[in-house]
Amino acid sequence: MPWALAVLAAAGWFESTAGAQTPQIGLAPTAQQAAQIPVVPQARFVVLLDAAHGGSDAGASLANGQTEKSFTLALSVRLRSLLAARGIQVVTTRESDAAVDPNRRAEIANHALAQACLSLHASESGSGVHLFASSLSPAQPARFAAWKTAQAAWVTRSLALTGAINAALQQAGIHVTLSRTSLPVVDSMACPAVAVEIAPDHAAASQTVHSDLDDPEYLTRVAEALAAALIEWRTEAHPL
C-alpha cells in the first residue's frame, strides 16, 4: 500500500469503491487480519452475510431459550446454502460462535467487494421482518471516504436493494416493516447494505403458517425469500 493510503487508513479513511471501474479498498488490515480476509474475484457477483453478535455477545433472548446469535448464524448458514446452489459466491463475517468486532465486520464486507450486504438480526418484538437502511444522507462517490460514513455513497443503491427484499418477502406472505436508522456496521459498509431483523410474524399467527422464531419452517421461508430477492438483484442490477 502506498504511504499516503496507509496514513489515510490510520486516520479512519479508505479509498472508496463507489463508481469505480476497478475498485480498490485502501484500508490496511494487520498481517494477521489480511490472512483471514477472503480473496474474491472481482468479476463474480458476491453477497456478504453478517450474522450479528457471537461469542460472549448473545444478542437478544428469543423464545425457548434461543439466542439471537444462534438464530442469525443458522439463518446465515441456510441462506448461504441457497445462494451457493444458484452459483452466487457468499462471504460471511462469521461461521461459528465467535465474537467479531463491528469494524472487522465492515472490513470484511469492504474487502470482499460485495454487490449486496445483509446484516442479519432477530428479535421477539415487532412482527415479521424489519428492514433497516442507513439513515445517512446520500453522497456523491469520492475517491476517499470516511470509514464511519462510507455507506453514504451507497445509500441510493441500498434503498433499491431494500425494495427488492421487501417485494420478495411480501410475495412470500411475510409482513415487512421499512425503516432507516444509524447502525455502525452498515454505515461503514461500502456496498449496497441492509440490516434484516426477523421477528415472529404475528400477522400470520391466525393462519396455517409457521411464524415463530424457533420454527425451522419459518426460518426456511425467510431464507428462501431473501435468496429470491438476491437472485433477482443479481439478474436485474448486476447480471453476470
Regions found by a protein language model. Give the residues of each.
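Generic alpha-helix initiation/capping and coil-helix boundary signal
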Residues: 2-4, 45, 102
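Bacterial N-terminal signal peptides
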Residues: 2-12
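Cleavable N-terminal signal peptides
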Residues: 7, 17-18
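Active-site-proximal helix/loop segments of hydrolytic enzymes
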Residues: 23-32, 36-38, 70-240
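N-terminal hydrophobic or amphipathic helices/low-complexity stretches enriched
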Residues: 34-48
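Short glycine-rich His-centered loop
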Residues: 44-65
